[in-house]
């Protein structure tokens, strides 16, 4: 995802192989690409086992939800980046001027652009799903079949945006003057824009389209999550406490009006309730003595106790339903927070790349005028997009209790099998 080409100097002797080429490659690796190589290696070591574990747990252990589909899609894109593009990136970095494999380069760069574009479109789908769930809870919600359609559309869009990489990228010639020896150049080959595209505007157009697309998606993501955050804060400070109390009061009120169950006293107290007329007090006492041994009286007691028990069970069920609603809402907020952090990491990891592309578009000689340290930092920043592919499992682990527990259970099972 970089273009570090140089203009062809005037050389009468060109060295295309041998010890000079290998020495120059080693020197360039040590002075410019070593930080990028170490960074990519770390991302590979974190991302490969992390994404494999995430994919297994969400595929085999998680219940089917829209969030599960989206996370599986993101993880699949990240896994391909980690398993395929990162090893290829390491190969290019360690043999930067000795990588003469045009076809491999084309597919390598194409897959990189495709996976990153796919992730951005899936994250856009996630933001829309979260927005509908939190800001428009009464509207029809996305279901698993809808989330699969979103993932399919994201895949198609990623192909549409990435296909120019198959044409533009390939083997590029890099002439390197030999210090102290005039008119002698080492001719290197690397994986960048092909030579015949360097004098055209196609690479610039490709970068501008990707940059504009990235900015549009970022604006959409920021807008969605800003509205979500506003709604969560609004409910947390004003609506949530009152609505919670109202829900409890509604349950109690409903229970109190259901045959006045909360006003029921013990059966004997209910029966001994005095009548308002004083002259009927003797008759009441007499009727009481008569009914104490009556079978109807026993049946009445059983009926009333059964009714009271049912009402109490109903009250408990409605209280539990309120708690269940609150628990589900809390879980939804936690899931949204986790997916927001994944989105934030994705956006942040692409900021250095976008900035460098903008600078490079405005000043074509920017890279050539940098010192060796500057070139090292430049190439390191260009590969910051790998952060998103490798660190997403870390976010899932730190922000999802259930995921952590599933990981513990998974490793316990492995440990038990070894024993």
Residue spans for each PLM region:
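Seventh transmembrane helix
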Residues: 337, 343-358, 377-419
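Class A (rhodopsin-like) GPCR signature focused on the TM5-ICL3 interface and adjacent 7TM helical core
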Residues: 122-134, 166-176, 208-244, 338-360, ...
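Hydrophobic residues within alpha-helical transmembrane segments
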Residues: 42-45, 73-76, 87, 107, ...
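Loop architecture of class A 7-transmembrane GPCRs
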Residues: 18-25, 99-109, 161-215, 220
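Intrinsically disordered, low-complexity cytoplasmic regulatory segments of eukaryotic proteins
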Residues: 177-189, 229-326
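Extracellular TM2-ECL1-early TM3 structural module of rhodopsin-like
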Residues: 29-41, 66-128, 133-143
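Extracellular N-terminal segment of 7TM GPCRs
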Residues: 1-49
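The cytoplasmic-loop to transmembrane-helix boundary for the fourth helix
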Residues: 139-159
